[in-house]
Amino acid sequence: MGQKINPVSNRLGIIRGWDSNWYGGRKYGETLLEDSRIRQYLNARLAKASVSRIVIERALKLVTITICTARPGMIIGKAGQEVDKLKEELKRITKKDVQINIYEIRKPELDAAIVAENIARQLEGKIAYRRAVKMAIASAMRMGAEGIKIQVSGRLNGAEMARSEMFKEGRTPLHTLRADIDYALAEALTKVGLLGIKVWICKGEVYEKRDLAPNFAVAKNQSRRPNAQGGNNRGGDRNRRRKGNR
């Protein structure tokens, strides 16, 4: 089933956190619909800002929105004018106070959503699909990906019959739940019809427990800097006891 299911949803609660973090109770449906409106609005409003992921957290009177983007400057604007304007627009949608956090993606070549969107924009610009895909694969492998798989579907090169073509390099173990696999789907509207682009990127395997909290800065620091003492630090404890006895 690893080949059929969405790799992101298959790893929720294991190595991947949720994009919506709140308790809705009886208003679950209304809150979920509002989340969908927020994401649709932000994706349309920030179409050129290379937005990868939008995480929404809710408190009683506050909505915290974390936007993961490769171009934070386009969202923040000069002296923060654009992000303040965006905050006021979101307040009208949610009818609550809104806090916006911007998280910069430092390696967009390893982000499936950004890679898929870039390929889609190139296909709309009449660039050959094989060239666009091979450039994306080369960039991802150069930036340290363990493997990447890209599927392009539709009327490729204007053919009368639609077909799918797959490009692979490296390893993408979809059945291995500890494998950190990012997945995204994008669509390109061309003169011959709609083309679909699916991207799978394997960034390695996660062996230690990962913090699934939506606070990206905390999760990033914890994953990069594990506890210096470690789980088995008998020598250090013994030295501290000797110093205390003296």
Swiss-Prot record:
One of its GO terms (molecular function) is structural constituent of ribosome. Pfam families: KH_2, Ribosomal_S3_C. One of its GO terms (cellular component) is cytosolic small ribosomal subunit. It comes from the Bacteria. Keywords: Ribonucleoprotein, Ribosomal protein, RNA-binding, rRNA-binding. GO terms for biological process: translation. Residues 38-106 form the KH type-2 domain. Belongs to the universal ribosomal protein uS3 family. Part of the 30S ribosomal subunit. Forms a tight complex with proteins S10 and S14. NCBIfam families: rpsC_bact. Binds the lower part of the 30S subunit head. Binds mRNA in the 70S ribosome, positioning it for translation. This is Small ribosomal subunit protein uS3. It comes from Porphyromonas gingivalis (strain ATCC BAA-308 / W83). The lineage of its organism: Bacteria, Pseudomonadati, Bacteroidota, Bacteroidia, Bacteroidales.
